[in-house]
């Protein structure tokens, strides 16, 4: 795959997995993502968003670090956790990155103990990650990348406040949102979480505009925040 200044070990793994040519989305986003800027990337299902996530994490982290995670990836469900782990296994073949996934059906104590031994990339579902970050107090000072994949279905399940709770515990890091559509909920979350993001829209369908008045999505967000504060 021909991308500017791509890691040689990553390049080799991409070629071995048949990824010899970068598609439009990979070409147009690679340099911006590599720069560390916040981004919103909109693209349809099957366009290679998961591959972009993995190759950019590998590109930035390069190899094994210290004990604390340096990339945090939020995905929709257990199936997505396993899928992302599999892509890391393939494309990270020539790196020593330590990747670990958590989901709602996993054992909390086992997950906490495993993470405490040292990992580089943590993948998980919103509920599980929120619960873990609330109770375990992980060191997030070395976190370089905070990535939200599957943003549209995740926000439809009203996980905004859990995501913000995790994001607010992190000081300076690159924040990236991936989704199939740029919905109102995503725009509201991005306004709260991202700093002057670059927006890449590869969705063929044109998005409708949003009203300036407070929307139903905003009201839902505020209600969710109030509910979680009472927990």
Named regions from a protein language model:
Residues 43-47:
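The conserved Walker
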Residues 1-42:
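Conserved pre-motif I regulatory segment
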Residues 27-39, 49-65, 89:
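Walker A/P-loop NTP-binding motif
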Residues 140-228:
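Post-DEXD/H (motif II) to motif III coupling segment of the RecA-like Helicase ATP-binding lobe
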Residues 32-33, 63-67, 92-94, 113-117, ...:
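Conserved catalytic network of the ASCE P-loop NTPase/AAA+ motor domain
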Residues 35-41, 67-71, 173-174:
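Pre-Walker A (Motif I) flank of P-loop NTPase domains
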Residues 2, 6, 10, 21, ...:
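Helical mechanochemical/support elements of P-loop NTPase systems and associated helical scaffolds
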Residues 3, 66-124, 128, 143:
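Conserved nucleic-acid-binding Ia/Ib motif block in the N-terminal RecA-like helicase ATPase lobe
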């Amino acid at each position: 795959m021909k991308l500017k200044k791509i890691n040689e070990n990553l390049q080799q793994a991409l070629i071995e997995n048949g990824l010899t040519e970068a598609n439009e989305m990979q070409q147009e986003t690679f340099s911006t993502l590599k720069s560390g800027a916040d981004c919103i990337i909109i693209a349809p299902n099957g366009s290679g968003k998961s591959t972009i996530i993995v190759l950019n994490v590998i590109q930035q982290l390069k190899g094994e670090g210290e004990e604390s995670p340096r990339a945090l990836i939020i995905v929709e469900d257990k199936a997505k956790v396993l899928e992302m782990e599999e892509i890391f296994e393939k494309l990270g073949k020539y790196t020593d990155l330590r990747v670990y996934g958590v989901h709602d059906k996993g054992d909390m104590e086992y997950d906490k103990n495993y993470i405490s031994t040292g990992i580089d990339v943590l993948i998980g579902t919103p509920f599980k990650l929120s619960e873990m970050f609330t109770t375990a107090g992980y060191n997030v000072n070395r976190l370089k990348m905070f990535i939200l994949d599957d943003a549209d279905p995740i926000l439809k399940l009203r996980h905004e406040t859990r995501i913000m709770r995790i994001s607010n515990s992190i000081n300076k890091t690159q924040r990236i949102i991936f989704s199939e559509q740029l919905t109102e909920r995503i725009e509201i979350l991005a306004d709260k979480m991202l700093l002057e993001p670059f927006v890449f829209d590869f969705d063929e369908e044109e998005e409708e505009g949003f009203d300036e008045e407070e929307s139903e999505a905003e009201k839902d967000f505020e209600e969710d925040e109030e509910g979680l504060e009472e927990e």
